[in-house]
Amino acid sequence: MSHGQPPPGSSMYGFGAMGMGSGMGSGMGSGMGTGMGTGMGTGMSASQMTSDPQDMMSLLDTSVFPGFDGMSMSLDVGDSMSNPFTPVSVPPPLPAGNAGPSHVGVCGGHGAPDQLFSPDDLIATSMSSAGPMIATPTTTTSGPSGGPSSGGGSTLTEFTKRRNWPAKVVEELQDWEHILDANGRIKHVSPSVEPLTGYKPPEIIDLFLRDLIHPDDVGVFTAELNEAIATGSQLRLFYRFRKKDGNWTIFETVGHAHIAAAKFAPNPQNQSPFCQAVFMMARPYPTKNAGLLDSFLEHKIENERLKRRIAELRREEQEEQEESHRTWRMSQEGRSDVTPSDDTATQMGMTPFYIPMNAQADVMMPPPSQPASSLNIALTRENLEGIAGSRPDSIREKMLRYEGNHADTIEMLTGLKYQEGERSHGITTGNASPTLIKGDAGIAIPLDRDPRTGEKKKKIKVAEEYVCTDCGTLDSPEWRKGPSGPKTLCNACGLRWAKKEKKKNANNNNNGGGIGGHNDIHTPMGDHMG
């Protein structure tokens, strides 16, 4: 196949019908197939051209162009001049409803934006002298919902086909991404460094990162960085960073060293792998969610500690109560062996352990006139307390000594006024039993006991609480009927509302009687008020 000037045809200066095709960047015609794309197809109407919103040629009116005849415009001399060339029509673009907006590509295809072309399309474009060539437009098929089908690739695939997509990902990161050299000098930072630290990227480039770290954390940072470079392991540390305004913020940093081969070393004499850069990613610590979690854990730990402390105090209190009951039982058993003279001596204010010999001889036998029931007087609570109080280090003293400490501890831990409770009354009255007060014959009388226990309690009528729907008052000598029902208005508002309703009813009666209509008998609202 030779390429030269074609011989003159039968209608050399004639022009046939020519329509504007769907691809401006695709070429100038299907007959001029010199690698310029699919061409401007024949027979395309203006309505078909305007169906593609991305087609720039759709703005032109085809009526101003005269038609071309069927002359062969191919550069191939092998074509017969007697047989006119039949143009190949380009398929019309997809309707707007079946496919999304398309873009005219280099090869005349309607593909996705920033779509890469296959090698076949590039070869077809470069072959400008290969004779007439019709490039097939590449279109992205769509599924029933109008989106790309499974064969067209996912959204992630389309995104990764775009130019500089890794840089776009880095720009959207909220964490601070920075690259250091082997000496710890900052070589690159992400745009997120400004909202986190206040520094703009040009201000922090070529600075040593250790110069911006708190002096107490520089040693840890240097050690971790050197270890990551030497071993190739991942580093993770926390350090305090000085922001532009002078304040300190804590960063949680992770990173790793990039170990390059020896052939990439700037020194040709280097024959071993070397650290080319250190990639690091930092974020503020703690974050908002981490701060909330830490606060919750702190409160949880404090709550558990208080629960354990309260359980210990209750256990100690229970042990002391058991000890007091045990001592009381032992005293009761000892009282059963006491002679009547001991009881009489106890009545006189002397304990049975310290009765003088002369007093014991005088009261050894009670007089016949004394009833035997008088021995029960020694079993009163006052006498028992006197016996317990006369002993050294009695239970009462132990309770006074320990309970004060417990109350102070509980008040300190819980903030509760523990000493204003029931136990404080028992301690201040000097009784061994904190829940009791002085009574008669050992009968315990609680503090909140009703003195009229023998009388039958009458049922107390609980006063109902009402609120006025008009003025909102809660105190009224009498509650009256209102528009919302009985006892919804106070005395003043109820009288005012009743007068208003009475006047309104009177006016309605007068108006109805003047027209000659119907007179209703209305009962005054005051008669229905409670």
Curated annotation (Swiss-Prot):
Domain PAS: 162-232
Region spans: 7 X 4 AA repeats of G-[SAT]-G-M: 9-44
GO cellular component: nucleus
Chain intervals for the UniProt region annotation (Disordered): 134-158, 315-343, 504-530
Keyword Glycoprotein among record annotations: no
Biased composition, class Gly residues, residue ranges: 144-154
GO biological process, one term: regulation of transcription by RNA polymerase II
One GO MF term: transcription cis-regulatory region binding
InterPro entries (UniProt xref): PAS, PAS-like_dom_sf, PAS_fold_3, Znf_GATA, Znf_NHR/GATA
A Pfam family annotated for this UniProt entry: PAS_3
Highest rank taxon of the organism: Eukaryota
Subunit relationships: Heterodimer of wc-1 and wc-2 (Potential). Binds to DNA.
Function of the molecule: May function as a transcription factor involved in light regulation. Binds and affects blue light regulation of the al-3 gene. Wc-1 and wc-2 interact via homologous PAS domains, bind to promoters of light regulated genes such as frq, and activate transcription. May bind directly to frq.
Protein's recorded name: White collar 2 protein
Gene field: wc-2
